[in-house]
């Protein structure tokens, strides 16, 4: 099973937008405050040096993990909704 962790901070429009899309699509996630020193150390230890929220970590069943930074999820300040589906390896709903 795939687990999603969202590293975010309060009152951040991009974090709110990302969480809104995750809720809308029905993707469960665990939220962590990216401003905490121990969280920053954990991210750095795992090779993720971007602290511009949101950052997401996807942990796959085989214990492999991937980090996706703000730049991976947003283009020109806008959330790329398809990126969320790609991150979770979900198929896109067909447009009718």
Please place each PLM-identified region on the residue numbering.
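Short secondary-structure transition/capping segments
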Residues: 41-45, 64
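Non-catalytic, surface beta->alpha helical segment in thiol-disulfide oxidoreductase systems
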Residues: 58-95
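Thiol-based oxidoreductase modules, predominantly thioredoxin-like and allied folds used
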Residues: 7-8, 26-41, 50-51
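Structural micro-motif
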Residues: 46-57
């Amino acid at each position: 099973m795939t687990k999603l962790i969202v590293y975010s901070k309060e009152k951040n429009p991009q974090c709110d937008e990302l969480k809104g899309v995750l809720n809308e699509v029905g993707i469960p996630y665990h939220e962590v405050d990216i401003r905490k020193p121990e969280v920053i150390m954990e991210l750095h230890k795992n090779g993720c040096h971007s602290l511009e929220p949101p950052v997401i970590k996807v942990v796959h069943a085989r214990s492999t993990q991937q980090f996706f930074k703000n730049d991976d999820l947003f283009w020109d300040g806008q959330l790329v909704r398809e990126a969320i589906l790609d991150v979770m390896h979900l198929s896109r709903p067909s447009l009718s």
